[in-house]
Each structure stands twice: as structure tokens, then as C-alpha cells.
């Protein structure tokens, strides 16, 4: 399959500028660059998933066979417009020998913000927000979720709604499974830089304007979960109930046996990955008794590669998700273990 990085190399000059920014900043949102990309002509398309295949039986001679057809479920996948205006005051650009670099740096920053926005939207959505695509947990199949907390394993309404703690996702990537969708036969593109007047408040907070160099980063974006077996989720991960090899092994059993070898990644954030690492104790053969130590930084679990991302939250309660979307700016990454200087 093609990833966003593959596609950007084939598109026009505006996309190549995005590619330059992605190469320096995209690792903060690796799911956006690692997941497959499907480009479509418009901004939506219909997909048909198989809800059940007929059980073909045997019959004696001269007896009729039951007429059964495959059961299908239809749904529409939509792309939504992502729009990142870029503007730098001409006075700043022309007064500095590094003015051109300032414009390039702002372009990279806006690109990083766009990728972080797509990444956050991949995993979360506010229920009332109709201007963005449904997130992965809304689209994934029923009965593809387990809890890391043994007290929340029973299939009840309360346990289904409980999103406290963090999550890790097992994903199968591909056009028939989990992939991003980009509309209008384009991904993200930068419009040519131009000089124009833009509105800006004066120092006295009155209406005014400045001359600025402007551009736009724009595209039509969505995500599709085309198979009920494309994604499995392990939720309610906390320090008391960390991610373990055993939990991932259990989550693998949610997939049909023929598909378990197709799982592309276990997607998790750094704190969840650290918790997994701490559960893996090793005992060196020192000859001085059993002295255990923490295992090395894991790159796989149950023979599935780990994709570490910053976009998955440590607490996925509604309050925490709302707080993440309430911010106008993505702050520099900060571990939840860190102390302020």
C-alpha cells in the first residue's frame, strides 16, 4: 500500500514542500505518515462490508438447497476540509536577513500542527462535532475491545462507556482494512506564497491591517475502517493495570485466526510503552542469585511491531478528551512523569 510520504512524492510542487516539512517534523505524528492512503475523486465514497457469508450445507438427491446470500452492510466514508492559513508580516520578513527562513519555519510549524490535528482526530472525536470524521473507536467492529482492568471485563453498558486510562490499538493496515482517505485526488498541499493585505488589530486593539506573505495548507481528509476485524483496542490501561504481553496475546484472539499474522502494528503512546517495558523483567546469569532488571526498550510485542505515537492520551475520559480539543495550540511534548524546573 501507499503511505502519505509515498503519495506526496508524486504530487505537485506544493505537496513537495509539505514533504520537506514532514521529513523534519512528521515523526511527532507517525500514524499520519505510516498508515495507508487512498485518494478519491470527490469527498466521499460508499464502502460495502460483509456482515455474514452463507453457510453452505449438504443435501440429498432431489431435495432443494436453501437460498442464502451474503449479508452486506453499506456505509459512506466522508472527507472533511482541513485548512491551515499561513501568514508572516512582510515587515518581519524584509527586515531580517533570515526572513525567508522565518517563512519556511512558519510553514513547517503549520504543517506540524496539521499533522498533529489529523493524528488526534484519528483516535478521538467530540460527540457534537459534525465537521470532522468519526474516529477509529467509533468505526471499529463490535466485540473488538478488551479492558486492562480485570474488574471491567464484564460486557455491561457501564464498562463499555468507561474510557478512563489509556488505550493501545492492534491494527491491520490496507485498502480493505484501516486507511486514511484524501479527497479531490490530492493529499495536503501548499498554495503558492503571495503578498496581500490581511486584517490585524492595532496596538490599541482597533481594526487594522498589515501586508503579509501568505499561503494555505489545505486538503480533504478522512479515515476508513473497512473491515470489522481491522482494529482491536485494549483500554483502561493505567500504572496499576499496565499493558502486558498477555493482554496483547488476548487482543490477538479477537481477530479470526487467519488474520492474526496480518496485524501491522500495536499503536501506543510512550507511557504505555514504558509500562509494558517495566512488566518485562529479566534475570541476568550472574551466578550471584536471581537479580532481576528492567528489559530493554521494546520494539515489538507478540511478534507485532510497536508504533509509538504522541496523539494517544494517558486518560481518555470525556473530560480529558475535551481538554485536548480545547487547546488552540499543540504544546511541545511533555511526559506525564516530568517535573517542572
Question: Predicted regions span which residues?
Answer:
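N-terminal low-complexity, intrinsically disordered segments
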Residues: 41-72
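Core alpha/beta structural scaffold of self-assembling particle/tube/pore-forming proteins
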Residues: 3-32, 45, 72-80, 85-341
Amino acid at each position: 500500500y501507499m503511505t502519505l510520504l509515498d503519495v506526496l512524492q508524486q504530487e505537485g510542487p506544493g505537496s513537495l514542500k509539505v514533504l520537506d516539512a514532514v521529513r523534519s517534523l512528521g515523526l511527532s505524528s507517525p500514524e499520519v505518515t505510516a498508515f495507508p492512503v487512498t485518494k478519491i475523486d470527490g469527498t466521499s465514497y460508499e464502502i460495502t462490508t460483509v456482515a455474514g457469508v452463507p453457510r453452505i450445507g449438504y443435501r440429498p438427491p432431489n431435495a432443494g438447497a436453501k437460498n442464502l446470500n451474503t449479508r452486506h452492510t453499506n456505509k459512506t466514508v466522508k472527507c472533511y476540509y482541513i485548512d491551515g492559513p499561513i501568514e508572516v508580516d512582510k515587515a518581519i520578513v524584509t527586515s531580517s536577513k533570515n526572513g525567508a527562513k522565518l517563512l519556511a519555519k512558519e510553514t513547517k510549524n503549520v504543517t506540524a500542527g496539521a499533522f498533529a490535528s489529523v493524528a488526534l482526530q484519528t483516535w478521538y472525536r467530540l460527540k457534537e462535532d459534525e465537521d470532522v470524521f468519526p474516529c477509529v473507536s467509533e468505526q471499529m467492529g463490535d466485540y473488538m475491545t478488551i479492558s486492562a482492568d480485570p474488574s471491567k471485563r464484564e460486557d455491561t453498558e457501564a464498562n463499555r462507556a468507561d474510557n478512563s486510562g489509556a488505550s493501545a490499538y492492534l491494527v491491520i493496515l490496507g485498502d480493505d482494512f484501516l486507511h486514511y482517505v484524501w479527497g479531490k485526488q490530492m493529499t495536503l498541499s501548499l498554495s503558492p506564497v503571495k503578498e496581500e493585505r490581511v486584517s490585524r488589530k492595532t496596538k490599541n486593539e482597533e481594526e487594522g491591517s498589515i501586508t503579509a506573505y501568505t499561503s494555505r495548507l489545505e486538503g480533504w481528509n478522512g479515515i476508513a475502517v473497512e473491515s470489522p476485524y481491522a482494529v482491536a483496542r485494549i483500554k483502561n490501561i493505567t500504572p496499576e493495570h499496565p499493558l502486558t504481553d498477555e493482554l496483547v496475546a488476548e487482543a490477538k484472539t479477537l481477530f479470526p485466526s487467519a488474520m492474526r499474522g496480518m496485524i501491522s502494528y500495536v499503536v501506543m503512546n510512550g507511557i504505555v510503552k514504558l509500562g509494558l517495558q517495566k512488566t518485562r523483567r529479566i534475570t541476568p546469569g550472574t551466578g550471584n542469585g536471581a537479580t532481576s532488571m528492567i528489559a530493554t526498550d521494546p520494539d515489538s510485542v507478540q511478534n507485532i511491531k510497536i508504533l509509538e505515537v504522541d496523539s494517544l492520551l494517558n486518560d481518555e475520559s470525556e473530560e480529558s478528551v475535551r481538554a485536548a480539543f480545547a487547546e488552540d495550540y499543540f504544546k511541545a511534548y511533555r511526559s506525564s512523569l516530568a517535573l517542572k524546573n
